[in-house]
């Protein structure tokens, strides 16, 4: 599968979130895929991932108040592959996108090794269609582990991780970065 290497076009705020956008989305496969996730909405209301907060009840609540895309909390790829209790905590129990209160979920992983990241992604059930590489976490633990925002300092490694996931998994791959500008 191909990766989504684009950002949403800017849209002006409006009282009606389903009002047609003034900006035409390019007719590319990634844009068509993203539009399909939004169920026809011209706007993406995304609940960004939050450590230990973006769990299932929070995602359900977020969707109740208009979010149409949600992330899981950051999942550590090495721990997901080696620690059974950790994996049980973060392993999806059902297809959230098909639940009446659910919707699309981006399963966010952090790590600094392409094979470990691939092994973690391959443990997910097949209905988990999208994985996200965390390149935004600025916390000290991410710095010590060489992942999150600090992975951006290792461009060659990041390219290896993205390339490995895109070519060797059957999931969509996105990368979350932090823009502190």
Language model features with spans:
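Glycine-rich, positively charged N-terminal anion/phosphate-binding segment
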Residues: 19-41, 50-126
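A structural motif
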Residues: 67, 128-130, 170
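Non-cysteine beta-strand/loop elements that form the S-adenosyl-L-methionine
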Residues: 72, 130-138
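Active-site-proximal loop/turn and secondary-structure-junction residues that shape catalytic pockets
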Residues: 76, 111-113, 137-139, 179-181
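Conserved non-cysteine loop/helix-boundary elements of the Radical SAM core domain that shape
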Residues: 77, 145-156, 181
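A short acidic, helix-capping loop that chelates divalent metal ions and anchors anionic groups
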Residues: 79-81, 140-145
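Alpha-helix-loop-beta-strand connector modules within alpha/beta enzyme cores
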Residues: 91-104, 151-175
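Active-site glycine- and acidic-residue-rich loops that bind
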Residues: 113-116, 156, 172-181
């Amino acid at each position: 599968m191909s990766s989504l290497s684009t950002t949403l076009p800017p849209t002006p705020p409006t009282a009606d979130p389903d009002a047609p956008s003034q900006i035409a989305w390019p007719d590319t496969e990634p844009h068509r895929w993203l539009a399909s996730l939004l169920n026809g909405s011209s706007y993406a209301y995304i609940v960004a991932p939050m450590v230990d907060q973006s769990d299932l009840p929070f995602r359900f609540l977020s969707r109740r108040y208009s979010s149409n895309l949600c992330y899981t909390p950051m999942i550590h790829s090495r721990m997901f592959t080696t620690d059974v209790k950790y994996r049980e905590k973060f392993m999806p129990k059902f297809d959230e996108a098909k639940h009446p209160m659910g919707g699309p979920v981006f399963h966010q992983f952090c790590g600094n090794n392409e094979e470990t990241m691939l092994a973690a992604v391959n443990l997910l059930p097949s209905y988990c269609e999208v994985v996200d590489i965390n390149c935004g976490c600025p916390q000290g633990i991410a710095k010590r582990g060489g992942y999150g925002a600090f992975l951006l300092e290792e461009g060659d490694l990041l390219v290896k991780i993205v390339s490995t996931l895109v070519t060797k998994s059957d999931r969509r791959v996105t990368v979350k970065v932090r823009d502190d500008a």
